[in-house]
Structures are given as C-alpha cells and as structure tokens.
UniProtKB/Swiss-Prot annotation:
InterPro entries (UniProt xref): FAD-bd_PCMH (IPR016166), FAD-bd_PCMH-like_sf (IPR036318), FAD-bd_PCMH_sub2 (IPR016169), FAD-linked_Oxidoreductase (IPR050416), Oxid_FAD_bind_N (IPR006094)
Record's protein name: FAD-linked oxidoreductase azaG
Phylogenetic lineage: Eukaryota, Fungi, Dikarya, Ascomycota, Pezizomycotina
Domain named FAD-binding PCMH-type: residues: 54-228
Pfam (any one): FAD_binding_4
Organism: Aspergillus niger (strain ATCC 1015 / CBS 113.46 / FGSC A1144 / LSHB Ac4 / NCTC 3858a / NRRL 328 / USDA 3528.7)
This protein's record includes keyword Oxidoreductase: yes
Family: Belongs to the oxygen-dependent FAD-linked oxidoreductase family.
TM region(s), chain numbering: none
Glycosylation sites: N44, N272, N348, N464
Length: 468
C-alpha cells in the first residue's frame, strides 16, 4: 500500500473511532429519557436494533439511535448536520438495494418505537407510525371491514412501501398504496417538523409519493381505507405446475391484456436438484367467488398440474395461506439476516420464447454452481386501479408495468458473488430485450441499486425531483 493510501486509511479509522466514542456525548444530552444510543461494537447491538431482511449489501454503521419522540428525530438530524455525520433511517428493514453498502461512518435512526396504529372507523382513515408493518394493521382493518393495498409479506413496512409506490394484489381495485395516502408528518433534512398533503406543501407531497425516501423522515402517515371487497373474503388458488415450462408461460401470456382487476397472479420458480429441474408454483388471489376464480384460471388449471388447491379465506388470513401455506413458514420473506442478492425488471407483456430460452439459461447456471440456491418471482398484478390515477399526479413513474420480475440470488458462498452478479445482470438484459418498454423499467422498492435515477424515476420526473 502506498503512503497516501496508508494515511487515508489511518485518518478514516481515527475519525470513525472518535465519532464512535462521541455518539453519546453528541446526541445524548437532548434526547428524551427513553431514547437509546447503541454502538455497533456493543455486544447486544444486533439484539436491540432492527435487523435487515438481507445482509447482502448492508450498510456499515457506527451505531444506532432509537428515538421515542418526533423531537428526538429532529434533534438527531440537526446534530448530524452540524457535525457532518451521515445517517440512514431504518423502519422495517426490508430494503434490499446494494447502494446501502457504500454507507460508512454514519448512524442508523432506528424507528422501532414508532409503531402506533389508529383506525378511525367513522372517518374511514388509518394512521400509522413510521415503522409500522402490515402485520400490525391487517387484523384491525379486517375487524372494521376495511382494507388497503397490502404486499405479499406481512413484515414489510407500511410507510416504506408507500414512499416507493406500493404495489399489491388489490391495486387493480384501489390503485397503488400511495394513491390512498392523504398526509404525512415529516421531519425534513434540516430538522423541521411539517405536515405534508395535497394542500400543505403540495409539490413535496407529489415527490413523496414515489420518491419519498429522499425527503426526510416520515414519522406517521394517514390513509383512506376502502370497504372490504366481497365481504372480506378472498379466494386463494395454488397450483404446483408440471415441468413443461413452455405451456406455463403460454398460460401466463393469456392474461397479458385480460387480467381482471380482482385477480392477481404470482409465480415462483425454484430448482430441485434431485430431479435436476426448475419447479414452478403459481399463486392466484381473487377477490370474489371461488367458482369465478377457477373459471378465470383455466389457462393454468387445464395444464394438469401436479397439485392444486383452492380455498376461500378471510382476507386477514390470506398471507398465511398463499403457496400452500409455504409463504407463512419460517424463513423466506420475513426471516432476518438472510443473504439475498436481488435484481428486478418490469415488463409490459409475456414473450413466451424469451421465457423458454431463459429457463434453459437458468438450468445451466444451476448445474454449473452446485451451491447456488437462486429463485425468481413473477408478480402479475392488475393495472386498472393504478392507471386510474393520472401519471402526472405523483412522482411514481411506472404505473404501466404489468409484471414485476425479481431475480433473487440466495447464497452464502463468497466465491459466487461475481458469477451471480454477472448472471443476474445478463438475465435482466435478456428480459429487457422483450419487455415491451423502450427503456429499462424498475420499481424502486425492488431496485438492485445499479440502475440509476433515470430508471427508478424516469428522466421526465427526475427534473422536478431534483428541484425539490
């Protein structure tokens, strides 16, 4: 190492060490009595702070501050600005972008104490604090015969999902989750506490809905709720498809232009090394009668699946039911500290030959890498509700996406890092060629991090966002 490199490293180490030792002195005096400061070097750090869903591309904190009041957050931000200390806000910890890996020598503002839920049944409004997750609100909403757009996992943060868009199985009926957002309480990057809505700071409210993670700390958010569809009952259909993949993609393509607003499809593809074949599971959620669901799903059910199941459940039990109940088992989308490397892309239609050729590429990669446990997820959600809001009304730029593909690399072997990244980038390019869009389209909440702001927000909206 050259002398300049040694000096740079030494100065960085000294600065980081000094900041680590001084966190209590800097932030402690003005925090409320129950707020906590935890150093990353503390033995109990991982037990008392919110852990991430994936450790791949994780940030490197000096420590975390756990505020209890909005004033605490204001104080933390003002002190951080004064001393040029970087900070990241942690809600549910479900983000997966690798851009966080570049975060060093800063602090986490851990919002774990901000989980209040208030449902005003008469006003049909729901207010949640900044770290509330969907499992906190599902039962209260169901009991009141109300609903909002929900994701496929109960551990996702309500506010975090909203700020990036908020796709879900109900979006055909109610639009994106951000379309139901009415107002937020926000601590700005300079430490001011303001309320933001269509009538208060309307330009900022525009930006918050789709690019909200860039504008401060949302301490609470208020939503319009909707009358529960079909009396609060939902049909869940699971299909374990045969290994003839071409017919599966052909069945999926049958819904390219005809997916009803009440129907949402999710396909999960994994690899069975025993039989040396990728396996496909199909989940369908239908907000209506079971007989109608089965009729609509005939393109899949006519394929003579290995196994299938259809059940009608209360909507608050839906997430425990999908994929034969496998989604609710320990692990997967809600277990913490997993190693998951995700790339994503949005499509406008299903190009069957492109899917067939990709399955061959995927099979070859599995065979070449025996310790690779990758999978991919296809979310085909209806767009009628999302498209009912003018594109110009919010910063969210991808209402026209019909299908989101998550290419998920699950592995712990560090030697797989380069080949997995190369393969998943090539996979994304493969689907981009037949995506139906001129440019790469990626939902920001699913973004890997290498796509760039033009992809996350589009060039058309980036100018306004930059001005904000």
């Amino acid at each position: 190492m050259q002398l300049s490199g040694i000096l740079s490293w030494l100065l960085s180490w000294l600065w980081a060490s000094q900041t680590t030792l001084d966190l209590q002195g800097l932030y402690g005096p003005s925090l409320s009595p129950n707020a906590e400061i935890v150093l990353a070097s503390d033995a109990n750090y991982t037990h008392v702070t919110t852990q991430r869903w994936t450790v791949h591309g994780a940030p490197h904190y000096l420590g975390a501050i756990i505020p209890v009041t909005e004033h605490d957050i204001q104080h933390i931000i003002k002190i951080s600005r004064e001393h040029a200390i970087n900070f990241l806000v942690v809600g549910a910890g479900h983000g997966a972008t690798v851009t966080f890996e570049r975060f060093r020598h800063g602090i986490a503002i851990d919002l774990q104490q901000f989980k209040d839920v208030h449902l005003d049944v008469d006003a049909e409004r729901l207010t949640v604090a900044g770290a509330t997750v969907f499992s906190d609100i599902i039962d209260p909403l169901y009991s009141a015969q109300r609903e909002i757009v929900t994701p496929s996992a109960p551990c996702v943060g309500v506010v975090g999902m909203t700020l990036g868009g908020g796709i879900g199985s109900l979006q055909g009926l109610h639009g994106l989750l951000l379309d139901s957002l009415e107002s937020v309480r926000l601590v700005t990057p300079i430490g001011d506490l303001i309320e933001v809505s269509e009538t208060q700071y309307p330009e900022l409210f525009w930006g918050l809905r789709g690019a909200g993670s860039n504008f401060g700390v949302v301490t609470s958010a208020t939503y319009r709720t909707h009358q529960a569809t079909h009396g609060g009952l939902v049909t869940n259909v699971d299909i374990f498809a045969a290994t003839e993949h071409a017919s599966i993609w052909q069945a999926l393509s049958a819904f390219d232009d005809t997916l009803p607003p009440e129907l949402a499809l999710t396909l999960a593809v994994a690899y069975n090394r025993t039989i040396d074949q990728p396996l496909v599971l199909v989940n369908a959620i239908y907000y209506g009668p079971e007989e109608q669901a089965l009729e609509l799903l005939s393109p899949f059910t006519s394929l003579t699946p290995i196994m299938s199941r259809s059940v009608t459940v209360p909507w608050n039990a839906l997430l425990d039911t999908t994929f034969f109940g496998l989604a609710a088992q320990e692990g997967g989308a809600c277990a913490k500290n997993q190693a998951v490397n995700i790339y994503s892309i949005g499509l406008n239609h299903t190009d069957v030959p492109a899917w067939e050729s990709y399955m061959e590429q995927l099979l070859q990669f599995y065979r070449q890498n025996p310790t690779y446990d990758g999978r991919f997820l296809v979310q085909r959600y209806p767009t009628q509700g999302a498209l009912s809001t003018l594109d110009s009304n919010t910063a969210y730029p991808h209402r026209q996406i019909k299908m989101h593909i998550n290419l998920e690399g699950w592995y712990t072997d560090p030697y797989l890092e380069d080949p997995v990244n190369a393969f998943l980038k090539q996979s994304r390019r493969h689907f981009q060629q037949s995506s139906g869009f001129d440019n790469l389209a990626v939902y920001v909440n699913y973004a890997h991090g290498d796509e760039g702001p033009d992809v996350w927000y589009t060039a058309e909206k980036l100018e306004n966002l930059t001005r904000l």
